[in-house]
Amino acid sequence: MTSVALYKQDGSQNGNVELNADIFGVEPNENVVFDTILMQRASLRQGTHAVKNRSAVRGGGKKPWRQKGTGRARQGSIRSPQWVGGGVVFGPTPRSYSYRLPKKVSRLALKSVLSQKVLDESFVVVDGLAFDAPKTKEFAAVLAGLNVTTKTLVVLEDDNVTAALAARNLTNVKVIPAKGLNVLDIADADKLVITQPALSQVEEVLA
């Protein structure tokens, strides 16, 4: 088992918490992390690019001149690709760039980035984040008490809406529920702050 410090909301230490070594103590695999980040970034692409082919360009229904007898090359439409203002041939069309990796690869990538955060001592566990009202100032004070000042990913239990609202206006802070934990967000953050209930949810899914 891997052990890390457990903090209270006020920043004081509240003992240690044992982490599942099968999740937080694996040998980080950079290759699967790279492949997973590529997959996630590809899925973020809108893919709405499009051009007009000759059938989509307005006009061009009438043959510009008769087929024979003019001495000019035969033409059937002023919207053919060789004409200025004509349609585009083999241009981009709307498409989805998303694809899926095998589940075992995705799970290994998630375990790898979590284990790397533990190795880098950038993994902070808090026993809970409870607020009476969604106050940004109070959430910022909690992070300051935890000595977290860099780009941070905060992972909350799925039903902690108040804390999520309290952090949404903070720069360099991203809040996600435990069920939304992903490789790209973890790798992009300098610090990962997770509540103990959220940690239990993550271990339940990945164990």
UniProtKB/Swiss-Prot annotation:
Domain of life: Bacteria
Basic residues biased stretches: 60-71
Pfam annotation, one family: Ribosomal_L4
InterPro entries named in the record: Ribosomal_uL4, Ribosomal_uL4-like, Ribosomal_uL4_dom_sf
GO biological process, any: translation
GO cellular component: ribonucleoprotein complex; ribosome
Keyword Transcription in annotation: no
SUPFAM superfamilies: Ribosomal protein L4 (SSF52166)
Alphabetically ordered keywords of this record: Ribonucleoprotein, Ribosomal protein, RNA-binding, rRNA-binding
Disordered: region residues: 49-77
MF (Gene Ontology): rRNA binding; structural constituent of ribosome
Assembly information from the UniProt record: Part of the 50S ribosomal subunit.
Free-text function comment from the UniProt entry: One of the primary rRNA binding proteins, this protein initially binds near the 5'-end of the 23S rRNA. It is important during the early stages of 50S assembly. It makes multiple contacts with different domains of the 23S rRNA in the assembled 50S subunit and ribosome. Forms part of the polypeptide exit tunnel.
NCBIfam families reported in the protein's UniProt record: rplD_bact
Similarity section: Belongs to the universal ribosomal protein uL4 family.
HAMAP family: Ribosomal_uL4_B
UniProt-recorded name of the protein: Large ribosomal subunit protein uL4
